[in-house]
Amino acid sequence: MNNSSELIAAINGFRNSGRFCDINIVINDERINAHRLILSGASEYFSILFSSDFIDSNEYEVNLSHLDYQSVNDLIDYIYGIPLSLTNDSVKYILSTADFLQIGSAITECENYILKNLCSRNCIDFYIYADKYNNKKIETASFNTILRNILRLINDENFKYLTEESMIKILSDDMLNIKNEDFAPLILIKWLESTQQPCTVELLRCLRISLLSPQVIKSLYSHRLVSSIYECITFLNNIAFLDESFPRYNSIELISIGISNSRDKISINCYNRKKNTWEMISSRGYRCSFAVAVMDNIIYMMGGYDQSPYRSSKVIAYNTCTNSWIYDIPELKYPRSNCGGVVDDEYIYCIGGIRDQDSSLISDIDRWKPSKPYWQTYAKMREPKCDMGVAMLNGLIYVIGGVVKGGTCTDTLESLSEDGWMMHRRLPIKMSNMSTIVHAGKIYISGGYTNSSIVNEISNLVLSYNPIYDEWTKLSSLNIPRINPALWSVHNKLYVGGISDDVQTNTSETYDKEKDCWTLDNGHVLPYNYIMYKCEPIKHKYPLEKIQYTNDFLKCLESFIGS
């Protein structure tokens, strides 16, 4: 006999005929014949049981009445070479029995079956099971499935069996698959209603309160399972004092604006989190050296060069909600390039740059209010400049560094308010062409050029400016020097990507605040040779935001699921 399967079949034949059997597994009134040696070889539990003082060597029976007979019988058949026949109903019993008997291969087979068949119809059931039996692999997989399908599950009959501890974990998770934070209170209310359990402050703390619409906050106030709890009403009365919340991963789209790898058009790319890739969603004719500003989910591109050798005064825009281009926007007062763009609650600002007629530097700051027919001059910088960093923070326009007369960099930092210009602490080094972002109450800049004379040295510097203390802090440098990179912030993390050169254009980096270091980010790799001008997190908008509050607003909100 030279085949192990034939050997196993022969031994199973001995068991079926009772030959050489030396142990009986007793479960209530049922008995299962077996061989100690075979059971010990497959099960750590039986190996310890039969090789210790737990059972006398002459003892012929082992009582396992606390276990499920069918599961034990199936597992002993499995030990003797008969494949497991698994179903969604049986696999939990067999897995917990295999775990008790410590049959490793059966455990793996059951886990693989569950992972393969995990879906929205069974994820809650498997999550509750895995939590009970402390199976972290199944618990993690089923929990992630719950997060992905949460809006489908709120009407599932098993939804009410989730514990408050589980709901706190679900509602707190950044990966909760909702495209608008208003759906989080809906999830909470549906669970409260299905369990008839009163709300707690711990549950309310899981909501990103600062991101909720007034209509949903009113709905929380008025719901009987919330309003009847004094502590909950007290919490809601003090939400104005809560810190600003970060959006969940799926409530925003990461949109990049740049020049396509063929370098013949502007490309709008969207980051696909499932595939960890950037996908082009739209494009138009070539343009470069333009300013970018984002207002109400519309990306505005101002000035720059098109396919002619002349600078442009045109302003075009891309609406991320309708996935369409907008061309009927008033032109700038005159053609310009290498300018900066920022927005406040009402206006879009175009700052500085280079004029088309004589390539002279510009000091003008022009602004436009959407729906108005023209741009108007708002102010003038103290010194004409281009390729500077610009930022809007606490209602002030900050202008950082840039290229001034003579083609040299400057180290100035100044802010503009209704009262005029104010000088601040200078940069540690003269810089231009850097990326700029406001993050956690500070201004961050990265990359660009650094030189006190001719602009020619590519930088990997990263600096942060604290407006409260009027001070600059040098952070860990980028791994790769970058010119005009895109700098963006998502979920309290900083990222930088792209470069306006032919080298390493498809790399991005992420900043670890605790370790003060930048690491190459494999999750946001750009298309090859794609020049990223700007990257913006775009918050999803829903028609419900325009709906007036009513007593059944949450039901109205539920009708938008899937839209």
Curated annotation (Swiss-Prot):
GO terms for biological process: symbiont-mediated perturbation of host ubiquitin-like protein modification. Keywords: Host cytoplasm, Host-virus interaction, Kelch repeat, Modulation of host E3 ubiquitin ligases by virus, Modulation of host ubiquitin pathway by virus, Repeat, Ubl conjugation pathway. Kelch repeats lie at residues 252-297, 298-346, 347-395, 397-441, 442-492, 494-540. Pfam families: BACK, BTB, Kelch_1, Kelch_6. One of its GO terms (cellular component) is host cell cytoplasm. It comes from the Viruses. Residues 123-219 form the BACK domain. It is found in: Host cytoplasm. PROSITE patterns: BTB. Its main location: host cell. Residues 21-88 form the BTB domain. Interacts (via BTB domain) with host CUL3. Probable substrate-specific adapter of CUL3-containing E3 ubiquitin-protein ligases which mediate the ubiquitination and subsequent proteasomal degradation of host target proteins. PANTHER family: KELCH-LIKE PROTEIN 32, LD33804P. The BTB domain is responsible for the interaction with CUL3 while the Kelch repeat domains supposely serve to recruit the cellular substrates. This is Kelch repeat and BTB domain-containing protein 1.
